[in-house]
């Protein structure tokens, strides 16, 4: 049995919890801002709770259509993060009613439709966002992740590379991480390793990129490098079932039974109901 790292982020770590995994709101210049990547996180968090944003939206002067659109979009994203998709869609409709060319609203609409499995609608929304914001790195990253999720990996990598052309992009590690994941899906391990290494060089604590590098080196029997990347995750974040399982398998393969037993005990204590603990009980280490 071959266990694979999950494409979306890890319990209590970073990323789209998942793809898990999502972001916030970041000004990009001009009249639009942009919201977060599908495969990672970027920007700041929305500027208040749902109740605060709703109150501010109601108090916004009727003529200030851009501010209304911005607040409604942030409110929609709050609901999206909480899994309240019907309410999120209503808020996005209100945002676009206020400003039909507010690119960030189309970006968030794409994320919502992607989560709902409405792929045609998601594709249309992302394309509209990029028609309005053709060089927006977050929108490019989000659309790239959508393309990867819908088995258009080569096209997705092109979008991630476009996202990286902006020298002011605040989260360049995220497109590199996503490009690595999509390269693995294409079976291109050397490219994936290179992308993950670039992600880690930009953000040494990027949990998903570190675990993926750890997994690559584990499968090559390069235990020292594998251990270094997994240890970085387990020492800086609350360990997940996935990170403990990888650490356990590294030590087992390296022949360190004491360390293996320690990780097994942690996995049992923390994640007794996890898929990883079931694999441990079944003795399926590869």
Residue ranges and their predicted role:
Residues 32-38, 47-60, 235-286:
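Terminal, low-structured helical/coil segments at or just beyond the last alpha-helical repeat
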Residues 62, 69, 103-104, 137-138, ...:
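Helix-start (N-cap) detector for alpha-helical repeat units in TPR-like alpha-solenoids
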Residues 26-93, 97, 281:
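N-terminal leader/linker segments that initiate helical-solenoid repeat arrays
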Residues 64, 98, 132-133, 166-168, ...:
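Structural marker of alpha-solenoid helical repeat scaffolds
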Residues 74, 108-111, 142, 176-178, ...:
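Canonical tetratricopeptide repeat
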């Amino acid at each position: 049995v071959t266990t694979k790292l999950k494409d979306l982020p890890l319990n209590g770590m970073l990323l789209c919890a998942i793809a898990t995994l999502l972001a916030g709101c970041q000004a990009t210049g001009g009249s639009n801002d942009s919201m977060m990547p599908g495969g990672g996180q970027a920007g700041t968090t929305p500027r208040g709770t749902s109740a605060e944003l709703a109150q501010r939206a109601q108090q916004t002067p009727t003529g200030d259509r851009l501010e209304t659109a911005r607040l409604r979009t942030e409110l929609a994203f709050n609901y999206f993060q909480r899994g309240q998709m019907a309410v999120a869609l209503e808020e996005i409709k209100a945002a676009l009613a206020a400003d039909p060319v507010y690119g960030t609203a189309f970006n968030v609409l794409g994320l919502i439709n992607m989560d709902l499995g409405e792929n045609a609608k998601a594709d249309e929304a992302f394309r509209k966002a990029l028609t309005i914001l053709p060089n927006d790195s977050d929108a490019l990253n989000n659309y790239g992740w959508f393309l990867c999720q819908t088995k258009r990996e080569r096209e997705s990598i092109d979008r991630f590379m476009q996202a990286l052309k902006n020298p002011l992009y605040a989260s360049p590690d995220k497109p590199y991480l996503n490009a690595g994941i999509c390269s693995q899906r294409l079976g291109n391990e050397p490219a994936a390793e290179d992308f993950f290494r670039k992600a880690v060089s930009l953000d040494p604590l990027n949990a998903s990129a570190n675990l993926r590098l750890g997994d690559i080196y584990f499968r090559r029997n390069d235990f020292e490098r594998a251990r270094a990347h997994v240890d970085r995750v387990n020492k800086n974040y609350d360990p997940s079932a996935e990170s403990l399982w990888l650490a356990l398998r590294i030590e087992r393969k390296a022949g360190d039974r004491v360390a293996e037993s320690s990780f097994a005990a942690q996995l049992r204590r923390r994640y007794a109901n996890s898929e990883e603990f079931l694999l441990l009980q079944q003795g399926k280490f590869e």
